[in-house]
């Protein structure tokens, strides 16, 4: 497997899990390559422009600091599968921020969004449409991944 995109120590540790039979079909490099393409489109619809960049560099940055956050004793106790799950969590934690043109065009046909919008407008009547939808996406980030 070409692992040139997998630069962090966490990713290198996660690769060892792919030697286990239940994970042999998983390709971290392919996942990261595809995710890199997808995450580069988060701002395409004009949303999240004031947020920090949430492309693959954001994920790489988080993976770089994880080594400093996890105590050495914990790192030694973690299995390769633990590292794999951690890396996958980092990879997909902001995936729900991606909004397609179709989704944005159909937002006013989305009952949960309309309810969210109504409730937020009651509290903050001056909130513009972009900020409303951006907040809706942010609040529902985890659910949007599935």
Predicted regions span which residues?
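Basic/hydrophobic alpha-helical interface regions
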Residues: 2-47, 63-67
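Residue-identity detector for threonine
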Residues: 3, 33, 49-52, 74, ...
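Context-gated lysine
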Residues: 7, 16, 32-34, 43, ...
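Generic detection of long, well-ordered alpha-helical segments
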Residues: 25, 56-59, 135-139
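Active-site flanking loop/helix segments enriched in acidic
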Residues: 36-61, 128-132
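Alpha-helical phosphate/pyrophosphate-handling elements in metalloenzyme active cores
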Residues: 48-85
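Divalent metal-dependent catalytic cores for phosphoryl transfer on phosphate-bearing substrates
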Residues: 76, 81-146
């Amino acid at each position: 497997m070409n692992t040139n995109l997998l630069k962090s120590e966490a990713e290198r540790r996660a690769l060892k899990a792919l030697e286990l039979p239940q994970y042999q079909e998983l390709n971290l490099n392919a996942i990261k390559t595809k995710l890199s393409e997808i995450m580069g489109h988060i701002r395409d619809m004009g949303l999240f422009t004031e947020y920090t960049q949430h492309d693959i560099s954001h994920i790489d940055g988080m993976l770089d600091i994880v080594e400093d956050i996890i105590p050495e004793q914990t790192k030694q106790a973690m299995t390769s599968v633990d590292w794999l799950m951690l890396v996958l969590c980092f990879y997909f934690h902001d995936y729900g921020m991606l909004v397609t043109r179709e989704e944005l065009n159909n937002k006013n046909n989305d009952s949960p969004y309309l309810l969210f919008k109504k409730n937020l407008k009651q509290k903050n009547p001056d909130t513009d449409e972009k900020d409303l939808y951006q907040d809706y996406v942010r609040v529902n980030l985890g659910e949007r991944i599935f």
